[in-house]
Structures are given as C-alpha cells and as structure tokens.
Amino acid sequence: VGFLGISHLLPAPTKCGQSELAFALLEQKGNPGWLYSVINGATTIWERWNSYIAETGTFGDVSMNSFNHYAYGSIGQWLYRTVLGIQTGENADEAGYHKIFLTPSWGGTLTYAKGEQETPFGKIASSWEKKDNSIVYHCTIPANTTAHLTLPASGHNSVQILEGAAITDTAAV
C-alpha cells in the first residue's frame, strides 16, 4: 500500500459497509500488520512493516529503519473517527468541534475502546465496552456544543439512556 495509501486502508472498507474487513486488518498479527510490531515489543510506530523480523531475530536495513515514524500512524485517525466515533462536521458552522458527531463502531475481537479529544471548547470523551450481551457506551461533550449520536443498534433489542441530557430524536432506534 505504501506511505500515501495507508491512510485509506481502513477507512475505505469502512465507508463501503465492510467494517469487519477493516477490523480484521487492524487485528492482523502477522507481517504486515499493526499488531506485528506490538507483539514484537514496539511501543511506537515503525517506519517499515518488517523493521524487525521475528523469525530470524534481525533488524531491517538501519539506513532506512526508524522505530519512531509516523508513516503507518494514520491508524490513529481511524481509531478516533471510527472506533471511538469522534468527528466534527465539514460545514463552517460545524467546524472546530462546535457541532460534534459521535458514531462509534465496534467489531472484530475488540471488547472495549476509550479515548478523548481535546477541542477549543473542552474535552470530548467516548468509550464503549462489551458486557454480557450488551454494549455500554459513555460519552461526554463540552459545554456550548451540540452532539449528534448515532449508535449501531440494528439487530439489538433496545437502546437505553441511563443518564445525561435530553435525547431529542431517537429515530431508527
């Protein structure tokens, strides 16, 4: 895929209704794959998928082998925008997180996700966890902002609001 195409690798199947494929790519443990480096001790994003070769215990060409490189770091954007679902609008009155869109997604073998986004208005928090046969979702938005929450609830028996401000439109629930 290369440095230029990697930022589209997970968003493309997600936008085409194939989010399970995106989650499978995220969770791929072999080389190439984001988890390959994690399984082999990485705490940063490597420049190359094969910066370290587990089978031989050797490192790739050190002249082009950064162990702290953003190239494949675009995965972070997909995790925030898709798994946590934190997004801002594209119109001028929505920009800068004045209007927030929360559209979390769960899939693959992930059992929870949790993250925050600092904005000019304050902190946005989004988290979900699979518990028994349910998914528990929590979100926090800053004062003086509005949020549109879309939960992937099709096929589920109910959506229950346990606390928080008014939910004004529950169509499609």
Regions found by a protein language model. Name each.
Residues 20-173:
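Non-catalytic C-terminal accessory modules of carbohydrate-active enzymes
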Residues 9-10:
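Conserved small-residue packing positions in alpha-helical repeats and bundles
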Residues 1-6:
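Generic helix N-cap/helix-start motif at coil->alpha-helix transitions
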